[in-house]
Amino acid sequence: MLNRGTFQVFRGISGPPKKSVDLPKYDLVIVGGGIVGCATARQLLIEKPQLKVALIEKEKELAVHQSGHNSGVIHAGIYYTPGSLKAKLCVEGLDLSYEFFDKEKVPYKKTGKLIVAVEPEEVPRLDALFSRAQTNGCRDIEMIDSSKITELEPHCRGLKALWSPHTGIVDWGYVTKRFGEDFEKRGGKIYTSYPLEKISDNHDPGYPIRVSSGPALAEFETKNLITCAGLQSDRVAALSGCSTDPKIVPFRGEYLLLKPEKRHLVKTNIYPVPDPRFPFLGVHFTPRMNGDIWLGPNAVLAYKREGYSYFSISPSDLLESLSYSGMQKLVKKHFTFGIKELYRGVWIAAQVKQLQRFIPELKLSDVTRGPAGVRAQAMDSAGNLVDDFVFDSGTGKLSPLLMHVRNAPSPAATSSLAIAKMITSEAINRFKL
């Protein structure tokens, strides 16, 4: 059973239904047109094709936020705590993803991935990571020496590295839209431009939940509700009476771009050995499906939940983040780290210096500023970044009819089909579908 402890180029697919005496009725409504929401909607109709299911999304199209603003990496499951949902679902999701891509002819590349130790003190941590990858069931992971590193990536230096041949790249935003397309082909209904405003008791035993949108003046009646709201997940869960803890704190990651004439420097994903003292993986090299090479990212507090630049500011969002006791404790704990991340965002030479540890011939003149993404990271009141996927139902009369995805950061895209299977299994049992 899921529980809280263990656990948003179809534009305007359908306009929202207007209020009427006869409201649209569904067996299940899913909130959120990101990759987890679309994968779950699709899986529900694969396993229960008789269901009447709708998916609602507040933006004009699918995959506008995290699902369309990410590195595009297909992860192998190396980093995650053995026995965690992240570890289990990422390893399972990797195979399910490649199976879907091959069957549906979704373009992808198996670029592989190097996790490189460049200093002697990093080698023991790399050895521990290798052991973790084996425990997690990651396939064909190798520990390689400096000569093999050079063979795989001629411009990269390192003492030792983990080589993950099944790590790849794909356009996860495109994948999300393919999931949505398949969901519609199976009889599902997608409503875009539908910002969720209210979840309420419908006072109807047949369709006990009423889902309302404010600006669109639209409503649904549904038997059950699943929310996969990403950057808004804590706020959406609170609409049904759930605790706001863990809170979503948005972190913006800013990338650099390698100039086209320098793309020959990078062939595969190149990552550092993660430092367990800090909450993020560090800067890395990421090939993209269009041929670009992304370098980075840093990790700084976003001034808006869905703000992708320094000039995108929501005073209310920023105040909410800064006034949260957990955020204050995190800042106190990692103040120096945070200042360095801000510095690297402003002065790209500092970011290039970190990248030169792996590719010494990289120069400041070889890079330009690139895109940014915002990561929905759940944080508890003690200032800890929640390390695993989190699911919740809350309390109250409607709680047996609800499921909320509260925390689904990376590797949620890779894990999406496995997450969808797990949520679907739980929904069938809990909701008696």
Curated annotation (Swiss-Prot):
Required co-factors: FAD
Catalytic reaction(s) noted: (S)-2-hydroxyglutarate + A = 2-oxoglutarate + AH2
Pfam families: DAO
GO cellular component, one term: mitochondrion
Intracellular or extracellular location(s): Mitochondrion
Major subcellular site: mitochondrion
Entry superkingdom: Eukaryota
Protein name: L-2-hydroxyglutarate dehydrogenase, mitochondrial
Organism of derivation: Caenorhabditis elegans
Lineage: Eukaryota, Metazoa, Ecdysozoa, Nematoda, Chromadorea
